[in-house]
């Protein structure tokens, strides 16, 4: 297939000199087969793939997101079973090519995910959060449970799904599946380390571990505290899911890889095409390959420069990149 097929279970060095991989998030499956993205690792959700009749053959590296945030945000539960997801993964790997890694059917732990938010809006509205009250067995007319108890349930389901998928997937796909640590606050993240250990999983020996429930945090200092604490306990192989890119200067040194689709949101909010040749073609560049490639290229260029500066703490601050 190309780079992904030969990537093995190690962090490849195709993107930066020190081996940090920055995956470009995209909602366009056909980009996998686009030669323009051969050298750009892509991160794509199963929700964008699973209803297709045919799949594109990837020309470069890619990784699979389970789409868990959207699933639980919209429905308060998973709408597919682990068995169905395992079958989908096998299909993707066969037709697209072997992914660098596979995200499990984890359960995010942000308070909005747990308790719901803006439920008067349409389910498809970005501000709508269904809440997991029903999944947690809480009666609709009764008081909800404390955050710590709800997080514990989400974490228990996250660990259980990782164990289940590891058994359902054939090798080497089961080795590409990554465990994910979830939590609402730092003590929760530390607690799930023990939950994995109790299940016989030593996260420090895995080739990659996902860091979840960080994409909507407003305070990058809190994320930095969580990442640093996990790294101090031996997790030096983390992938940051949908990381808040303007905080990577605080915690990026502890991440082996990360993904972001911030380019698309940035272009959507811009409200008009970025490039002259796009005027009259589309109203903005939220779906534009050229905009995505330019953003990713700027990220990598700044990342490399930042790594060369001894005083630089981590990957880079992407505020300037997203404004470029």
Segments predicted by a language model, with ranges:
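Low-complexity, flexible helical/coil segments
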Residues: 56-57, 74-83, 97-104, 215-220, ...
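Non-catalytic, usually N-terminal nucleic-acid engagement modules in DNA/RNA processing proteins
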Residues: 1-164, 315-324
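Alpha/beta catalytic cores of nucleotide-metabolism and tRNA/nucleoside-modifying enzymes
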Residues: 1-35, 67, 167, 198, ...
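Eukaryote-skewed repeat-based solenoidal scaffolds used as protein-protein interaction platforms
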Residues: 90-258
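Generic detector of well-ordered alpha-helical segments enriched in charged/polar residues
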Residues: 86, 90, 178, 190, ...
